[in-house]
Structure formats: C-alpha cells, structure tokens
C-alpha cells in the first residue's frame, strides 16, 4: 500500500497544536518563598538598622522580608530576626511596629510548621566578597567613617543591589563615582552622613550603566 504524507493547512495545524499546549507560569529562583538570597536579607537588615532611614524605605524592606521565610540558621547567622523583633518591640512608628510584628509572627509560625524543610540559601562567592570589601574600604575613606559603620555598609549594599547583584563594570564605575563625589563635595558628604539624602537616592543619582 502506498503511503502518503498529508499536509494540513497552517491554520489547521496551529489549531491542533494548541490543543496540546499547556500554560506554564515561569518563576525565577528568587521568587520562590523558600529560596533566600542572603545578600537581600543583609541589605534589608542594613536598611532597617541605619539611623535616620526614611520611613518608606523601612516599610518597603519589611514588606520584602515578609515575602520570604528564612531558615532558623539564616535568622541566627544574619540576626535579621533580632532586628525585626527589636522594631516590633521598640519602634516609635505604629505602622512600622505593626508590620514588624506581622513579619515576626509569620516567620515564627512558618518555622514551627516547617522545621524539617530546609530553605535554599544563595550566597556570594569569595571573589565577589573580596571585591566588595575593597569597595567598602574606598567608600569608608571617602565618607570619613570606619569601614564597618552601618552607613558605609548600607551604601555598598545599595550599589550592589542597583547593579543587579553583580560586581560588574557598572558596579565599579558607580563606586568610583560615589567615592569621587564624597571626597570632593563636602556638602554632599554631610547630607549623606546626616541622613538628609537617603542612601538609595544618593546611589541612584550616581549610578553608572554597563
């Protein structure tokens, strides 16, 4: 018996294919609740602990933290639980205090119910950490503060965040631009130190592209 290849019209073929299609929702690794990027946790902690931080920045940080559920180990190593709990107990702002309470309660409940389910932790490699440490040193010298000061850490973490968490050319150029500005613009340096110029706004104004 002869064999024939039957070619359907393009529209008919598309209709048949569509019957077998399935709808998939793409999810990034970071969008999953049990995936915890340590750098993000450290950044939010830095934001919450920096004196004079604008309220909107603190609210945003708490809302982002509420989307994640760090493991007991991450809570201990980063001490983010201590930071949130401190805001829950001692914040003078009712909204911040209430939101911190929600985050703390959410984490505690989730950990108690999922104690045996580990979270996935994403950390920076040693080379990246080394380069970032050098950037912190340059920033600390420019702003005339110790390298472990909360403000220095907050600035560097914001640069890293706005550079898509990559020590790229954009990251290096942004650090250089910030260092130059802090060294040669005394009034700007004072504004950043006093908190009159929020760190995220300061970094964004000097952000360099790749």
Swiss-Prot record:
All copies of the TFIIS central domain together span: 131-210
Q: Where in the cell is it found?
A: Nucleus
The domain of life for this entry's organism is Eukaryota
Cite the Pfam families for this sequence: Med26, TFIIS_M
| One GO BP annotation of this record | DNA-templated transcription
GO cellular-component terms in the record? Answer: nucleus
Q: Does the keyword Thylakoid apply?
A: no
Q: Which residues form the TFIIS N-terminal domain?
A: 39-114
Q: Does the keyword Nucleus apply?
A: yes
**What are the protein's UniProt keywords?**
Nucleus
Q: Which family does it belong to?
A: Belongs to the TCEANC2 family.
PANTHER family according to UniProt: MEDIATOR OF RNA POLYMERASE II TRANSCRIPTION SUBUNIT 26A-RELATED, TFIIS N-TERMINAL DOMAIN-CONTAINING PROTEIN
Its name, as the record gives it, is Transcription elongation factor A N-terminal and central domain-containing protein 2
